[in-house]
Amino acid sequence: VWGQDPQIDKNGRFILNEAWAKLDFGKGFFAQLGRQTLVYDDERILGGLDWNVAGRYHDALKLGYANKNNEIHAILAFNQNDEKTAGGTYYNSSIGQPYKNMQTVWYHYKADKIPFGASLLFMNLGLETGNQLTQDSHTRYLQTMGTYLTYKNSGWNLDGAFYYQTGKNKDAESVSAFMASATAAYAFNKTWGMVVSFDYLSGNEEEI
């Protein structure tokens, strides 16, 4: 069933990791449908998780366009559990993907004259918050948006990211959080280099 398998399968069984078809419309436009990895920027939000035996995959439709300096992707995903003869549309994320549906737009700009790149991301996740016992389904939506910037020259490699999250989580609680990160790397020669980086997560507010 489309979207029934978990994002990371640890059961040691035989599974299909990737199976997709891509249609090239010409002039930079394409559509890609099926089970596929979604890898963007520094993989903080969407990544392949290649250190896991099975990797990370999504059953999704990806629509895209690319030219010399610009690239944009629109991603649509919908998940469901095994076939049901009764019981409604309740989705149990503990045995499948962590989200019920997803809509994502990603844009990347690559400059011509300087080694600079910038990405923008907006993701809307539909999370099941219904009642598993009664099979009543209710979907809450969580939005993540932000940017990822890079600059590289002969010695320096700089990148930074900022993401903000709002909406409702799977417990139907209001969310307002952010994450910021930055990395500066310098290569003294082919053997020696230095890297300085930091991450900041807003975390949860203390209950009073």
Indicate residue ranges for each PLM-predicted region.
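Solvent-exposed loop/turn segments at secondary-structure junctions
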Residues: T37-Y40, Q80-N81
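Small/polar (Gly/Ser/Thr/Ala-rich) solvent-exposed segments
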Residues: G34
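Surface-exposed loop and membrane-interface regions of Gram-negative outer-membrane beta-barrel proteins
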Residues: V1-K27, Y40-W51, N131-L133, Q165-V175
